[in-house]
C-alpha cells in the first residue's frame, strides 16, 4: 500500500506439506457415479498477513491469489475432482515476535 509491496520479500514464508491422513466427502462414491475415478483431491491455502493493510488490499490479495490458484490447478481439475480453499487471516496476535536477518537482504539502500 502507498507504493510499498503488499508482501515484502523478506517477510514472505511458504510452507507446503501433504496430509498423511485425510478424508474427502463421501469417499469417492459421487465421483465414481459421475464417471470419475472417485479419487478426490483438495488444496487448502491459508495466507496469514499482519495487521495494517486496508480491507481493499486484503480483498485484492484474495482475488489475485484465487485467480492464480484457479489457473494453476485448472489442468488438474480437468482430469479429476478437486476442491480448492483459500482463506486469509489477518493477525490478531496476542504475541508476535520476529527475529530475522533476512529482511536486510531486501532493503534498498
What does each model-found stretch correspond to?
Residues 10-14, 75-93:
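A short amphipathic beta-strand at an alpha->beta junction
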Residues 26-28, 32-76:
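Mid-chain, well-packed structural core segment of small domains
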Residues 50, 62, 89-93, 108:
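Mobile acidic interaction elements
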Residues 93-109:
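Short, low-complexity, polybasic intrinsically disordered segments
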Residues 5-24:
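Short, glycine- and small/hydrophobic-rich beta-strand elements in well-ordered beta-sheets
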Residues 21, 52-54, 93:
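Generic "edge-of-domain/loop-turn" microfeature
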Amino acid at each position: 500500500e502507498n507504493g510499498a509491496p503488499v508482501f515484502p520479500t523478506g517477510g514472505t514464508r511458504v510452507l507446503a506439506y501433504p496430509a498423511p491422513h485425510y478424508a474427502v466427502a463421501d469417499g469417492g462414491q459421487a465421483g465414481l457415479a459421475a464417471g470419475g475415478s472417485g479419487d478426490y483431491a483438495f488444496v487448502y491455502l491459508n495466507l496469514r498477513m499482519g495487521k495494517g493493510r486496508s480491507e481493499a488490499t486484503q480483498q485484492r490479495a484474495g482475488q489475485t491469489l484465487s485467480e492464480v490458484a484457479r489457473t494453476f490447478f485448472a489442468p488438474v481439475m480437468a482430469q479429476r475432482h478437486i476442491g480448492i480453499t483459500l482463506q486469509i487471516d489477518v493477525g490478531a496476535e496476542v504475541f508476535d515476535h520476529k527475529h530475522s536477518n533476512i529482511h536486510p537482504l531486501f532493503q534498498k539502500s
